[in-house]
Amino acid sequence: MAGHDDEEARIETVKDAVTDMKLERQSSTESVAPNGILDTITPKDEPNGHLSSKPSTPSLKPPKSRSRSSNSLAKDEVPEEKVGGDITIKQEPGQPPKLARSASQKLPPRAAPLFTDLPDKTTEATSTFQLMEVCTYANKYLGYTEHAMDCDCAEEWDAATCRNTACGEDSDCINRATKMECFGDCGCGDSCQNQRFQRREYAKVSVIKTEKKGYGLRADCDLRPNEFIFEYIGEVINEPQFRRRMIQYDEEGIKHFYFMSLNKGEFVDATKKGNLGRFCNHSCNPNCYVDKWVVGEKLRMGIFAERYIKAGEELVFNYNVDRYGADPQPCYCGEPNCTGFIGGKTQTERATKLSHATIEALGIDDPDGWDTAVARRPRKKKAGEDDEEYVDSLQPKSLDENGVTKVMAALMQCKEKWIAVKLLGRIQRCEDERVRHRVVRMHGYQILNSQLNTWKDDFNVVLQILDILDKFPRLTRNKIIDSKIEGTVSPLQECDDERVAEKAKALLEIWSALEVGYRIPRMKRDPAAVNNTPTANHYERRETAKDDRKPNSSKSRSRSRSRSRSVDVTRNAPRGPAALTRGGGKGHMHSYRPGQRPFRRPFNPLPKGWFAAESNGRTYYYSATGETTWSRPTAPAVQPPPPPKRESKEKTLQDIIDGIMNAKENTPKAKDKSATPATPADAKIPEKKEHKEKWRSYSEEKQKKLYENTLFPHVKYIVDKFKHKLPKDDLKRYAKEVAKKLVNSDFKNNRVEDPTKISDKQVKQVKKYCKEYFDKAVAKHRAYEEKKAERKSKGSVKATTSATIDKAETTSTKAPPQFDGAAETGDEDSDVQLSDAEYEDGQEESSHHSGLKRKRTDDEDFENDHENGGVSPTKRQRSASLPIIPPPPPPMSPSNLVLDDGSREALKRQRTEGAEDDEYGDSTISSGKRQRSETPPPPPPPPPPADIPPENIESENENDKDQEELQDYDVQEANWGKEDNIAIQSPSHSPFPAQSISNHSNTARETDSHS
């Protein structure tokens, strides 16, 4: 007890000696920490003057003995005062008091005080500001950082706790090691342990009222080291706004502000809006630290436990502040190593202070050695001097595997060039291949890609990064592609610095030679369909009964973790099969309800293409082609031919339209059937009275379009006559040109009374003009072909001129010269001169001998179509293309139960004939659908093997065959006169009815006339 009393007396003496000292005021300019990591915070709104600052990592531990310093200042130069026991205070003019470096013993640690007796002031404290759950950003670019990367962890579900233990504190999660939260579709699954910021997994804390420090934060439960306590939330602002608010709050009488430095030039202001994290006080011996984490695309700040914290302890961290102004703020932490003031020196006079994590990443052996080495320099730091000069004399230790995590985490958040250079230098000097593999695994390519984009204007830093990339172990291109670093290195090939250009070019050549390793693609999860409740599934992994009987066993607990979600332990899994093995009997089977059993292949299945059906209790077998048999087949069935490829809807519709137009034009007039059929007059469709004059409300452009559509059938009538004389593309172009000329001329001369119809006289004039137009085009085309043939004949010595011309006319594929209708008939704006003379079709047909035969054949076909039911041209073409199928052979002998090859072929032809008859009678699609179905409908069973005598069956089959041949012969004889251009194999082999044969022959004649 006496020793304890002496210790308390000693601490009180130190506290009194520190607080009674007077420091000379010194003026200093306001500035921001140049390194962007040290945080500037101003005091809190309580008389304690405690600051709310933002250190970026764990605060410093209690300093070790500094008696090892060999360059300590002489004692006679600096006055010292012994305030109690072995503790000595050193005082310098104008400087805050500090412990003497000559102390030979470490300060004795003290037990952390508990504040369990203080009442909860959370409600009272939250009334002084606006409570927020997330940070607000002045603009969307504030707090932005590189997107979080995917980790390599897999799901690990613990059945006992029903939690996903992946990415935990003790795991080797890459994201957790580099201070990134798993975000989106990481492979670790839903609700992993590395989503604390997103799920707001705050510790149980409460606000208390302290004696001297005002409001403080108290832990209501025990906390483990590195446990997440609270996120520091407020308004994220930029530096100009920060400076304006400093002045604004001072004018409003707010003496204590809550600013935390989030990034270089970015601050979190929790003065008026924030959460309970703003009440965490300062201490020179803290139990918490502040760290920055990447969450999605934002950088966020959280408070974490630095050591084991008991319930009732006050949560404090080292503000590590750079003071703005000359007035030092007193510190009331009461720790043995307390310097008495928060921040100490002003911004321009301070010594270099870095976060604990940054010091470890730089390779400094002892965090205290950093401050000691800086303080022992023979001169003070000058205003505006870079911190880099203070660390040049320090030799960092070599990088090992354990230090890679700290280096990559610090490099990920580094915004200061001199710190980035030091960290990159540690990686560059490393020669251990295992360490380099570790760097690559810790998102090495992604982090170096970010640094390369940040410092691409500094060629020295770029060379340093390229040298590190060149030393990386390379097996595949996967990580290089995922990091997208090739897009950053590629522009460096055009760099002004030759060293950078050569290095970048060589690196890209090496990368391009690597192969891409195949990886199983990760399943993309739908964020909206996330369900955190484990559900029972018949195929999921179940826990064994042994694990259920030993819930407290560590061995069974370790086995209960699996890669996938396990069955909910609160539900009773079916135990039917297990009950039978234990002698449960039928009683246990009553509650066993298995799920749907998997499909099992039937025993001794039929060969491919065969199916079974029943008839009168007997089983027979059939194939898709119609082959049937009573005996079980042993060989695969002959597969039916694939269904014909269906035409597209657009082509089918166009064929229907063309068929209607051809039938309309080929319709002869009733008054002169004997004469050569003239061009059909325009079909007058009766319209409703109210729609008769609707076209008058249209614009002139729309009326022209309507009139052009009216002329189109008559222009097409002439175009069809020239389709074998001109190339298709030229024919279409000329048709459009002549239609435009006719429309413009008629509208210019006011010859259009109604754009929806034209008179018979106009029809003849239009056709005459179109014929003259295309005759000139044909003449031009032939002249062009002749000239081309002459040029070919000159180049060929052996070929004759006549042979060259014939060959050019038949095999030429070049486009003919552009036919300028305006050059022959006048300008486009000039009127089209239409004569009143009637256009005689006989003149045209006399000049084209083959056209007369085709026209007469078309008229006959049209009449036959109307007499026989109006079969469209499309159907006629389909009929012509189908092969003629011979009739089926007589049925097989019932005495032969096993079909031979001839019988099978006969049944196949018989079945195919039935399908063709259905197709021509109904639709061409039905048979295709039957062929595509998996199991076709069973055909009628084959004749019974023994019920009917064979003699009767053979006689009936012969009579049926004779009758079918007689009917087919009658049909063939009735249409014999029309089939002059196509040969039919045999009357008895024709499966087509009379109508189909007639259409078939007409189509053949039409094809022959065209040729």
From Swiss-Prot:
Catalyzed reactions per annotation: L-lysyl(36)-[histone H3] + 3 S-adenosyl-L-methionine = N(6),N(6),N(6)-trimethyl-L-lysyl(36)-[histone H3] + 3 S-adenosyl-L-homocysteine + 3 H(+)
Region (Disordered): 1-118, 527-604, 630-650, 665-697, 782-1011
Post-SET domain sequence ranges: 327-343
Bias (Basic and acidic residues): 10-27, 74-84, 538-551, 684-697, 782-793, 901-914
Keyword S-adenosyl-L-methionine: yes
InterPro entries in the record: AWS_dom, Post-SET_dom, Set2_fungi, SET2_Histone-Lys_MeTrsfase, SET_dom, SET_dom_sf, SETD2/Set2_SET, SRI
Chain intervals with Pro residues compositional bias: 884-893, 935-948
GO MF terms, alphabetically ordered: histone H3K36 trimethyltransferase activity
Pfam families xref list: AWS (PF17907), Med26 (PF08711), SET (PF00856), SRI (PF08236)
Cellular localization per UniProt: Nucleus; Chromosome
Extent of Polar residues compositional bias: 798-815, 983-1002
Residue intervals of the WW domain: 604-635
EC number: 2.1.1.359
Main subcellular localisation: nucleus
GO cellular component: a single term: chromosome
Biased segments, Acidic residues type: 825-844, 953-971
UniProt family annotation: Belongs to the class V-like SAM-binding methyltransferase superfamily. Histone-lysine methyltransferase family. SET2 subfamily.
Name of this chain's protein: Histone-lysine N-methyltransferase, H3 lysine-36 specific
Annotated source species: Coccidioides immitis (strain RS)
Gene expressing this chain: SET2
